[in-house]
Every structure is written in structure tokens, then in C-alpha cells.
UniProtKB/Swiss-Prot annotation:
Keywords: Endonuclease, Exonuclease, Hydrolase, Metal-binding, Nuclease, tRNA processing, Zinc. Zn(2+) 2 binds at D68, H69, D212, H270. Zinc phosphodiesterase, which has both exoribonuclease and endoribonuclease activities. This is Ribonuclease BN. The keyword Zinc applies. Homodimer. Its EC number is 3.1.-.-. Binds 2 Zn(2+) ions. Belongs to the RNase Z family. RNase BN subfamily. HAMAP family: RNase_Z_BN. The gene is rbn. Its cofactor is Zn(2+). It holds the Pfam family Lactamase_B_2. Zn(2+) 1 binds at H64, H66, H141, D212.
Length: 305
């Protein structure tokens, strides 16, 4: 998997940062895909500067209904429809996202020519496509807001073909059953348990993508042990009280969460427009002082998971 940041500003766009949107590129050899997390104003325009377009999107996850995370959605849906893409799309989000989509399409005389499914979520598992699971966590914000934890299922370990050949099993259809961990019966009556010839399973990758939030109990469960945590750092440590009062987090609080959750890497985003490049570097330094494995996202930054 890899993350492509389309917008990294909080509240309003700046000359160098658009409002929130993140692509998750699912780099699977047989079932690749592209998911979008939040869709602030101008998201479809930002996508024009990437290798992806709205027609490739399979799922969109909205954290909450504040405009800087949502106002780009109607235009993106309409453009996807005008392009003649017939592939289905599912939108996940809090209560009200269905009404928002229906109302904006109706009042603007717009529609979608592709199957559009809208799922209003609550805390808990919301998706398992056989390759990965998505769990929603309710966060602390003035509006109903969620963070999404995406975890790939573990991959089976490699089959020890050399040991199987030594046991008299020739490559062929039986290998597929053995690779699945099944027990097969050979022509001579012997039974071979595939699990005995498999290397340990390879742990799937995981990412936690937070919506806007002040520190809350659910945050630790959402982030616990993930390879990558994407979290807002709206304000610096000196403005922590102001951040929390508005349902946001400071640099210090975000980095402390990353450390306590034992994540592999923290990616900072949702930066207040008050910070210029020098100010952003100060935010990054504040996080790294607590959690060194921290990166600052810019628009069009790409990070592997």
C-alpha cells in the first residue's frame, strides 16, 4: 500500500496546500485498487496531478461533514459520472452523508450514471473485502467524526517446494492445496499436511487514518501497533488548549499518541494556514522531539506503508 496526499491544510486552502484528501493505493498483484479518505474542495483537481482519476476510485471514506473534508465530493461524483465510468462506487461516512449527497445532487440537477452505494457508519468493523479489513473509530470532534484503521490480512508463508520434492511430491495441482494449508492424500496413500511445509505467515500492513480529533480514548485503539499513523497536527504545542477546545490536537499530543501506540511511523497533516514553511518545520521538530519517526506531509507527498 502507499499513501498519496492530495490536500494537507486545515480548514481552508493555502497557496501550497489544499484541504484534506488522501489516496490509499492498494498495490495488490491481482486485486489492486484506489480508495479516497476525505474529499475537501478541489480534490478532483488535485487528482489531475497524479496518476489516478476519479474513475479508478472504488471506495471513499468520509471522516466527518465539515466542509474542508467534504465539499469536493459532489463535484467528484458528477465528474466521475460524466466520464462514463460504469464501475460501482461506495461512500462511507457519518450520519448525514447520504442526505448531503442526495440534496446537493438534487438541487443542482445532477445525477450519477454508475451504481452508487452510501453506507452511514458507526464504530466497529465496516468492511472486509477478503484481503483487508476496515474498522471505524469514533473520535472527539464537534461533529460526528471517525478515524479508519485499514489492516491487510496476513499472507500465507512460502511453500517449501524443495522439502516437498524430497518427500516425493511433484509440482502440480497438489501444490496449490498444500499452499492453502490443506492436507492432501498422495497416490501411495500417504497424507501430507501443507501446514508442515509452510513458512510462517507474513503479517499484513496496517495504517490508521485519523479524522479531526482532540485526544480521546478511542485514539489509542485506532493507532495501536500500525505501520503508519496519519494524524492531524493542526496547532503547535503552545496552542494546545485552543486546539482541544475546537476538537483538534497539538503536535505534542499527536507525537505522544504515536509513541504510546508504538506505531511504526507518524505522518503529520491538517496543518493550520497560519504556518508558513518555517512554521511547518517547527511543528515537525516538536513532533520529532517526542517521536523521531515522524514525517510532514505536503500536497502530493507519497509514503509507502
Amino acid at each position: 500500500m502507499e499513501l498519496i496526499f492530495l490536500g494537507t491544510s486545515a480548514g481552508v486552502p493555502t497557496r501550497s496546500r489544499n484541504v484534506t484528501a488522501i489516496l490509499l493505493h492498494l498495490q495488490h498483484p491481482t486485486q489492486p485498487g484506489v480508495w479516497l479518505f476525505d474529499c475537501g474542495e478541489g480534490t478532483q483537481h488535485q487528482m489531475l496531478n497524479t496518476a489516478f482519476h476519479p474513475g479508478k476510485l472504488e471506495r471513499i471514506f468520509i471522516s466527518h461533514l465539515h466542509g474542508d473534508h467534504l465539499f469536493g465530493l459532489p463535484g467528484l461524483l458528477c465528474s466521475r459520472s460524466m466520464a462514463g465510468n460504469p464501475h460501482p462506487l461506495t461512500v462511507y461516512g457519518p450520519q448525514g452523508v447520504r442526505e448531503f449527497i442526495a440534496t446537493t445532487l438534487r438541487l443542482s440537477g445532477s445525477w450519477t450514471d454508475f451504481p452508487l452505494q452510501i453506507e452511514e457508519v458507526s464504530a466497529g468493523d465496516i468492511l472486509d473485502d477478503g484481503l483487508r479489513k476496515v474498522t471505524a473509530f469514533r473520535l472527539e470532534h464537534p461533529l460526528e467524526c471517525y478515524g479508519y484503521r485499514v489492516v491487510e490480512h496476513d499472507k500465507p508463508g512460502a511453500l517449501n517446494a524443495r522439502a516437498l520434492k524430497a518427500a516425493g511430491v511433484t509440482p502440480g495441482p497438489l501444490f496449490q492445496a498444500l499452499k492453502a494449508g490443506k492436507t492432501v492424500t498422495l497416490a501411495d496413500g500417504r497424507q501430507i499436511n501443507g501446514a508442515d511445509y509452510l513458512a510462517p505467515a507474513v503479517a499484513g500492513k496496517s495504517v490508521a487514518i485519523f479524522g479531526d480529533t482532540a485526544p480521546c480514548e478511542a485514539a489509542l485503539a485506532l493507532a495501536q501497533g500500525v505501520d503508519v499513523m496519519v494524524h492531524e497536527t493542526t496547532l503547535d504545542a503552545s496552542m494546545e488548549e485552543k486546539a482541544n477546545a475546537r476538537g483538534h490536537s497539538s503536535t505534542r499530543q499527536t507525537a505522544t499518541l504515536a509513541r504510546e501506540a508504538a506505531v511504526g511511523r507518524l505522518i503529520m497533516t491538517h496543518i493550520s494556514s497560519r504556518y508558513d514553511d518555517k512554521g511547518c518545520q517547527r511543528l515537525l521538530a516538536e513532533c520529532r522531539a517526542i517521536f523521531p519517526a515522524t514525517e510532514l506531509a505536503y500536497d502530493f507527498s507519497v509514503f509507502p506503508v
